[in-house]
Amino acid sequence: MAIQHPDIQPAVNHSVQVAIAGAGPVGLMMANYLGQMGIDVLVVEKLDKLIDYPRAIGIDDEALRTMQSVGLVDNVLPHTTPWHAMRFLTPKGRCFADIQPMTDEFGWPRRNAFIQPQVDAVMLEGLSRFPNVRCLFSRELEAFSQQDDEVTLHLKTEEGQRETVKAQWLVACDGGASFVRRTLNVPFEGKTAPNQWIVVDIANDPLSTPHIYLCCDPVRPYVSAALPHAVRRFEFMVMPGETEEQLREPQNMRKLLSKVLPNPDNVELIRQRVYTHNARLAQRFRIDRVLLAGDAAHIMPVWQGQGYNSGMRDAFNLAWKLALVIQGKARDALLDTYQQERRDHAKAMIDLSVTAGNVLAPPKRWQGTLRDGVSWLLNYLPPVKRYFLEMRFKPMPQYYGGALVREGEAKHSPVGKMFIQPKVTLENGDVTLLDNAIGANFAVIGWGCNPLWGMSDEQIQQWRALGTRFIQVVPEVQIHTAQDNHDGVLRVGDTQGRLRSWFAQHNASLVVMRPDRFVAATAIPQTLGKTLNKLASVMTLTRPDADVSVEKVA
């Protein structure tokens, strides 16, 4: 598809494997992952620097695991507040829903507050590790065109200079108003909320109470959130007839803050900004050699803090697939599984966010009264209370089709779900999280068994070419048993007993884990070879010259 562009001779030409439009969190994460895989990447950003004001304030365990996968989590954690509870309050201040999950099944706290600009800066700095990755600011994408084997981008600098980029693939991470998506005429279906909200960020937190509170005041609903580094965020609904200019006036801002602070004059304002909450989903995530990710593919209200995290899921799902395709290890049909796996879950998170917004600010007054009464009764039912406390209402990513092989009923299968990340003990005695032992790779993990036993030599060659790590998990007391060592297999001890419980629950002894930490397949030693062949087929992996044997049997 050709797009018209200015007929001006470009002054600079770039040639890369992947061009990324947008240096927001999703674009930066994509660039970090592809960079560590050796892919030649160019990130282009219209602005002259990263956005420096707070935006998203919630980062979950899955997103922290994604940060871990690119070696940045230790630099991100200082800008987070772990175990950040969310509490819904009635107009009288009674907590009717306390969301405070204490699980760390994926290695990190499930709910965390964070300062997005500082985390974005960590990701930008992370790109300096890779000589194959560049990030250019003050570059406006004016036009682009797709050919059979490449995408051509036409850029303009602040000085009016033109530049051309030739890339094998274009990943559009250019936000909810995505130029790329609009140019390709991809429908962005959904709705815009009728109410706006004004966000007020304050330094030297004048409240300094922990957690986040959503106060369901029928007169003017508001949010109060404690953020890292002594930042307090307030969000107030903008009422009909009010404008941003009016609310920003000192006397009106004072009136707003007097609702939540005893002394609204003694504050250090960082910024005030009005937001409109949208709930929209792109009809397609892949258009030939262009892929949409993050807000360019879906936008949602902020009430569950899942806009940022959904973008991180996009980046993790897409990046490893794109790397395999560029490296010639898989055909580009693998990229079709990106939309197949991500779009339905993005829609589920949009629906959850819209529902949470309706709980905070019901469209009709009687709905708020009903909410308060029903919630008061339900809080006396322990199963209901645990349902909210443990955040069980959050739709966990589960893929029913795509780059995976499932045997049996999907409902109870671990295939298509994220694998746990407990602590494990290495043979040198060090204790670490499982992903640290695996790296940014596929893994075949076996409980007690040699994971190579059920594979032919050709299969071992094929999966090692993907960087696959072969892991044998044993009870921690067996970690130093020499006779159980196998060449090419990493042995780890089950420090917390969680891996034993996982394998026992799912009636399997082997799991194939994808680089994004999702379970691609389960097996036992005698069926592993057959399962790996099926998985190689659905992932359209390229094969060695020799025919791959089906499986090894006793």
Curated annotation (Swiss-Prot):
GO terms for molecular function: 3-(3-hydroxyphenyl)propionate hydroxylase activity; FAD binding. Gene3D superfamilies: 3.30.70.2450, FAD/NAD(P)-binding domain (3.50.50.60). It holds the Pfam family FAD_binding_3. It comes from the Bacteria. Its EC number is 1.14.13.127. FAD binds at residues 17-46, 285-295. It catalyses: 3-(3-hydroxyphenyl)propanoate + NADH + O2 + H(+) = 3-(2,3-dihydroxyphenyl)propanoate + NAD(+) + H2O; (2E)-3-(3-hydroxyphenyl)prop-2-enoate + NADH + O2 + H(+) = (2E)-3-(2,3-dihydroxyphenyl)prop-2-enoate + NAD(+) + H2O. Pathway: Aromatic compound metabolism; 3-phenylpropanoate degradation. Signal peptide: none annotated. Belongs to the PheA/TfdB FAD monooxygenase family. HAMAP family: MhpA (MF_01652). This is 3-(3-hydroxy-phenyl)propionate/3-hydroxycinnamic acid hydroxylase. The gene is mhpA.
